């Protein structure tokens, strides 16, 4: 029996996790937390808001599934990593912002870090047990979001409702907007660097509208290995919770005889500059990914509130990065301080852009 603590229980990932737990008697939900919605009776221990690490201390879980949105998930990620508790990570922002500090905590703790992002779950399966010297590169796929194929000029008047209409995935509002700007893929690029210890120049991104191929690994002999499956988050959630076993899910295998078409293309960097901004921040190192993430969270929230135009998201992120020095953080306290500084700067820049 695995004891599961679910953080972010009322979001998209949280709800799908509950489905998986209900279907697997070997999984026991011992604790659940949400940001603001009531969850009384969902688990023996529940919490709304507050310090999630206190809940984790009381719950003593075998696995923490962190589906908190944004930087707020950072303390829970570090709690699990430092204690060697298996971490099923949907909160990519905590690894992006935590960077080298998170990796060091993971190495000290010695537990498993199992990504819940579909692309990184696929990459984990493709890379596991494979000697890194045999790997040429990792390819992450992006659906292209709801605005795939549009030019930059076509995006000036995009409204939040349009950005939230994702063509293939069912996700929460923040990650759906990130998908529309391609920032989500930028964050995933940085996440892949830290998860798999791959240099940035060996991580590629391609647009794949059907979201059937989740990741590919190119090998040095010229061969490529791909992970295919329906775009359904219950598959990577189940994989992370039941690892190293592989349990059944209600998701059917692909019907390869049904005229499956696999289309790939290059991202449009002019229309969607967030991907390039993320790559540059990752390559810069230090706390640049933390600043990138904080500025993006501020800008996306302003866009969803109708205060910032869609194209302003990338502008706020770029200007925030240009205004802040990003030295490496020596500890979690410095990381939190850098996040706060980036949010103040991004908020001020947002006000300037809309007035």
Q: PLM features: residue spans?
A:
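Catalytic, metal-anchored helix/loop core of enzyme active sites in primary metabolism
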Residues: 1-42, 47-355
